[in-house]
From Swiss-Prot:
Gene Ontology MF terms: tryptophan synthase activity
Protein name, UniProt field: Tryptophan synthase alpha chain
Keywords: Amino-acid biosynthesis, Aromatic amino acid biosynthesis, Lyase, Tryptophan biosynthesis
Subunit structure: Tetramer of two alpha and two beta chains.
Name of encoding gene: trpA
Amino acid sequence: MSRIADTFARLRAAGRTALMPYLMTGYPERDSVLDLAPALEDAGADLFELGVPFSDPLADGATIQRASERALANGVRLEHCIATIAVLRERGVRAPIVPMGYYNPFLQYGLARLARDMAAAGADGLIIPDLPPEEAQECHAACREYGLDLIFFVAPTTPDERIARITALASGFIYCVSLTGVTGARRELWSGLPAFLERVRRHTTLPLVVGFGISSADHVREVGRHAAGAIVASALINVIEQSHPGEYVARAAEFVRLLRG
């Protein structure tokens, strides 16, 4: 059983919703994640989505775009992201770590090499928002060879036949986008979310994890009524962005504790 599958099985048995914070590698400082991830795990994070900075992050809203730009300015590239995961494992972080990055840097690095190096560092999967299932065969094969889960997005606008195609390739969990458009914190969840998740569930037994727009403990509780987990990205990056340099780790951990409830 993979570390991701084991985590969801354990949380399901405990009746808990998985909380998956998003951190950008290299933000706000080059090695901030080395302090943030252990603190957030202690505060109640169950898994991590770890952003790989990219110059044109099409799926991301303004908050994560700013974080990506800052990380790039800090000199962070894919190799540093892989090295960061290895250091986190050396420092005792046990939660699954799933890097999220765009396809072009991964392709340039080499997909087999990427899967090998990510797995060796201690990553558990890959999220590639601009990789359609029709073009995912090579990446899927590389991930399978090295024991990584390949995570795909489904959105409210995704037709049923495409959901079936995506879920046939996916492993680990299904990333269910809670709204149309780019990432960003929202005040209220979409009222159609339960029906959308039920539609996805007809095609898979994998855990459903909801992202985009989740920003409060109430959101996490509501998502937990219908899905296995919740991803909190822009709201957490906002907390870090609005903190003084010496305070962002403590404030981020406090926010995760509030989300956990």
